[in-house]
Amino acid sequence: MPKRKVSADGAAKAEPKRRSARLSAKPAPAKVDAKPKKAAGKDKASDKKVQIKGKRGAKGKQADVADQQTTELPAENGETENQSPASEEEKEAKSD
């Protein structure tokens, strides 16, 4: 491969960087597909409505049950909950 000629001032020019055609080509635009399954989509929407109605009732019941369970659970980290200072005094009075 022949070297580039040195210019009059003696400095060598840098070779231009070349890229392959594959890398320099612009990426293909994304294809936008039309949705031809409109009839199938309508069927799915009607099915979803039926399922949602069924789920709403179940969720409401589950939420009530969950609320009851959380109130009955002891304190976190194994600590006992103190219900009120008055109840502790009553326990001490009974033990005397």
From Swiss-Prot:
The modification N6-acetyllysine is found at K13, K26. Keywords: Acetylation, ADP-ribosylation, Cytoplasm, DNA-binding, Nucleus, Phosphoprotein. Residues 1-96 are annotated as: Disordered. Its main location: nucleus. The modification Phosphothreonine is found at T80. The modification Phosphoserine is found at S7, S20, S24, S84, S87, S95. One of its GO terms (biological process) is pyrimidine dimer repair by nucleotide-excision repair. GO terms for molecular function: chromatin binding; nucleosomal DNA binding. The modification ADP-ribosylserine is found at S24. It is found in: Nucleus; Cytoplasm. InterPro entries: HMGN_fam. It holds the Pfam family HMG14_17. Phosphorylation favors cytoplasmic localization. Phosphorylation on Ser-20 and Ser-24 weakens binding to nucleosomes and increases the rate of H3 phosphorylation. Belongs to the HMGN family. Interacts with transcriptional regulator SEHBP. Binds to the inner side of the nucleosomal DNA thus altering the interaction between the DNA and the histone octamer. May be involved in the process which maintains transcribable genes in a unique chromatin conformation. Inhibits the phosphorylation of nucleosomal histones H3 and H2A by RPS6KA5/MSK1 and RPS6KA3/RSK2. This is Non-histone chromosomal protein HMG-14.
